[in-house]
């Protein structure tokens, strides 16, 4: 008999060799009926998996993300099966589940049309109705290669696997696919599927490889859940920063400028400027000193920092090492420059902590397939910073960084949209990371202890660290469900040594400082994108590029309108007036479409009484208010950063 510890902490005994499904069934017929997959000792597994020793076990239903993933992964195979039925010459690539659905990549001479997607969806429903059996099996490498010999992408994937790795397949009726799983036991409970769209995608995400056709879809157990999801997708389209940001004239792009190089228009630039001034003032209030460093440096600097060895492919290099005496590169990070500033003078323990901040323009050579609007770009502006601390100061300063970030998030109204990810190294990936296992383990243990002391609720992620140390990533989902890193805090164990940074301790001895890397508000472009989507372009008044719009009823009242503009502008309000000879109703509608927080209509009565007729986003038509009273209210709303 083996002991199985269930999610609720209870321990049950079972015969060795029972499957996860059989264990679920022994607990409850209903649980087995609703089960999609299991988690054994923290690892997601198939319900078919046999349990042969003492384990901890969770049974996952569709209510869990693991359960949703198993259902949608299974349906991605149904899509591939349908493609092979209708377009048998198509070659198969990969088909994983993703946050809100699944995709499958195909190599087809002619891309799938909208009509093709309709046919495929109908064929998928037909397959689900047939409810073919789902079987998992394993093969040795030579037999696996023989089975997949007509599928070049599958052959490549098999060859990529390590010699000792298990090569598993799933058979769905007459269709077989290379797959590690997990998959559901039966398609019968899946009542609602939808193919969303198709797009281009490079094989393995590498633009040097062939462009494939990716079909996105989703699946639910109930039609009502699918309908709710599709409604959310439509709302997301309306909020998409790529669409809304252009409509509101916040940013634009141009093919002659280049991909991943957005141009902030005056309104977008005003929002970023407002954020930047606020962040820099807040950092200085908390003891930061601001620096201004070059946009490029000689390769020598990046060789010291390790960027040249571990990050060169992500940098824009100016010159040829073989031909030029000096080779420069645009900076991907600010850290080497601020460390050079630190080393410009000797420091005592009394000088520490030193908190450097900088609004940094950075450059990263992202692949074309990765770039998206303001989220993923090649040039961006980062609220960068590095804290040089003693070992005794590390936890308190880390806490101070988090308090700053949490204050900024709460003020922006995005604190509830954030999740925390503790990003660790992969000891097998020595090309990506500095190869010092002892230092990695020590630093990761230190960060974990700090996070636990601060009661941060986080998940751990392997192979997501910076090359020089572990980090805490603050993740935010965009309207399409994709998770992006908005803020990051890192503990650096390597670069203080590489730059020979030191301080003199109280005993007069030279010591290495610890370094905390952090971005207080992250990349301004990405934060702007998140805020566009969060507020659907209707930013809080303090952040709105135009806070007030004055609309004279006719040109007879232009002089009074201009006096209102001057009065408020002199007090720092961002204000415009619309003097066009258009009907007032038209001008009001247009100002509303621009998401202007306050619209002030002025005519004969308002001019005579020094008033303004106020229309606000919150209260609509508020009637006539004395200009002084409105000014006081507006300035208070801006000063308190009311949302």
From Swiss-Prot:
Gene3D superfamilies, alphabetized: 3.10.20.30, 3.30.54.20, Anticodon-binding domain (3.40.50.800), Bira Bifunctional Protein, Domain 2 (3.30.930.10), Threonyl-trna Synthetase, Chain A, domain 2 (3.30.980.10)
InterPro entries xref list: aa-tRNA-synt_IIb, aa-tRNA-synth_II, aa-tRNA-synth_II/BPL/LPL, Anticodon-bd, Anticodon-bd_dom_sf, Beta-grasp_dom_sf, TGS, TGS-like
Presence of the UniProt keyword Zinc in the record: yes
Residue intervals of the TGS domain: 1-61
Enzyme Commission identifier(s): 6.1.1.3
Enzyme class: ligase
Any GO BP: threonyl-tRNA aminoacylation
Pfam families, per the entry: HGTP_anticodon, TGS, tRNA-synt_2b, tRNA_SAD
Molecular function via GO: ATP binding; catalytic activity, acting on a protein; metal ion binding; threonine-tRNA ligase activity; transferase activity; tRNA binding
Catalytic activity: tRNA(Thr) + L-threonine + ATP = L-threonyl-tRNA(Thr) + AMP + diphosphate + H(+)
A GO CC annotation given for this chain: cytoplasm
Cellular location(s): Cytoplasm
Subunit comment: Homodimer.
Name of the protein this chain belongs to: Threonine--tRNA ligase
This protein's encoding gene: thrS
């Amino acid at each position: 008999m083996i002991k199985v510890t269930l999610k609720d902490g209870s321990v049950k005994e079972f015969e060795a060799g029972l499957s996860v499904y059989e264990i679920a069934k022994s607990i409850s017929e209903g649980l087995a009926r609703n089960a999609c997959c299991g988690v054994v000792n923290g690892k997601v597994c198939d319900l078919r998996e046999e349990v042969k020793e003492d384990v901890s076990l969770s049974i996952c239903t569709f209510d869990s993300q693991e359960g949703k993933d198993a259902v949608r992964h299974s349906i991605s195979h149904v899509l591939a099966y349908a493609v092979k039925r209708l377009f048998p010459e198509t070659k198969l690539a990969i088909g994983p589940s993703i946050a809100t659905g699944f995709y499958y990549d195909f190599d087809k001479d002619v891309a799938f049309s909208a009509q093709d997607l309709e046919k495929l969806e109908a064929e998928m429903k037909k397959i689900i109705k047939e409810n073919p059996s789902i079987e998992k099996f394993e093969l040795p490498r030579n037999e696996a290669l023989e089975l997949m010999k007509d599928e070049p992408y599958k052959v490549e994937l098999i060859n990529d696997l390590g010699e000792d790795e298990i090569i598993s397949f799933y058979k769905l009726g007459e269709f077989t696919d290379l797959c590690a799983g997990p998959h559901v036991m039966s398609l019968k409970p899946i009542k609602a599927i939808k193919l969303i769209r198709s797009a281009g995608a490079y094989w393995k995400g590498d633009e040097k490889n062939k462009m494939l056709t990716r079909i996105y879809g989703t699946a639910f157990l109930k039609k009502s859940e699918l309908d709710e999801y599709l409604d959310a997708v439509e709302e997301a389209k309306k909020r998409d920063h790529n669409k809304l940001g252009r409509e509101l004239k916040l940013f634009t792009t141009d093919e002659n400028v280049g991909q991943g190089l957005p141009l902030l228009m005056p309104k977008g630039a005003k929002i970023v400027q407002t954020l930047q001034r606020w962040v820099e003032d807040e950092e200085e209030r908390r003891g930061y000193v601001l620096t201004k460093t070059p946009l490029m440096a000689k390769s020598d600097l990046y060789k010291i920092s390790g960027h040249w060895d571990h990050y060169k492919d992500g940098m824009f290099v100016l010159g040829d090492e073989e031909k030029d005496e000096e080779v420069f590169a645009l900076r991907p990070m600010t850290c080497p420059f601020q460390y050079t500033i630190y080393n410009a003078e000797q420091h005592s323990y009394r000088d520490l902590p030193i908190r450097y901040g900088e609004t940094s323009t950075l450059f990263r050579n992202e692949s074309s397939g990765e770039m998206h609007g303001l989220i993923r770009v090649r040039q961006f502006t980062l609220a960068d910073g590095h804290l040089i601390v003693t070992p005794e100061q590390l936890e308190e300063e880390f806490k101070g960084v988090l308090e700053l970030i949490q204050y900024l998030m709460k003020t922006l109204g995005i604190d509830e949209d954030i999740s925390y990810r503790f990003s660790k190294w992969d000891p097998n990936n020595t090309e990506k990371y500095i190869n010092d296992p002892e230092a990695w383990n020590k630093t990761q243990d230190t960060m974990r202890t700090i996070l636990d002391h601060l009661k941060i609720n986080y998940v751990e992620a392997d192979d997501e660290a910076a090359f020089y140390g572990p980090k805490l990533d603050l993740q935010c989902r965009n309207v399409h469900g994709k998770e992006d890193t908005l803020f990051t805090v890192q503990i650096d164990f390597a670069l203080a040594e590489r730059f020979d940074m030191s301080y003199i301790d109280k005993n007069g001895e030279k010591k290495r400082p610890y370094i905390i890397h952090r971005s207080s508000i992250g990349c301004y472009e990405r934060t702007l994108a998140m805020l566009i989507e969060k507020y659907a372009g209707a930013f809080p008044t303090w952040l709105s590029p135009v806070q007030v719009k004055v609309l004279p009823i006719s040109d007879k009242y232009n002089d009074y309108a201009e006096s209102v503009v001057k009065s408020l502008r002199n007090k720092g309000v961002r204000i415009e007036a619309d003097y066009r000879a258009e009907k007032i109703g038209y001008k009001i509608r247009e100002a509303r479409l621009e998401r202007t927080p306050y619209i002030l209509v002025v005519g004969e009565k308002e001019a005579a009484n020094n008033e303004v007729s106020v229309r606000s986003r919150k209260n609509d038509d508020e009637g006539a208010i004395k200009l002084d009273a409105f000014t006081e209210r507006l300035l208070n709303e801006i000063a308190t950063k009311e949302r």
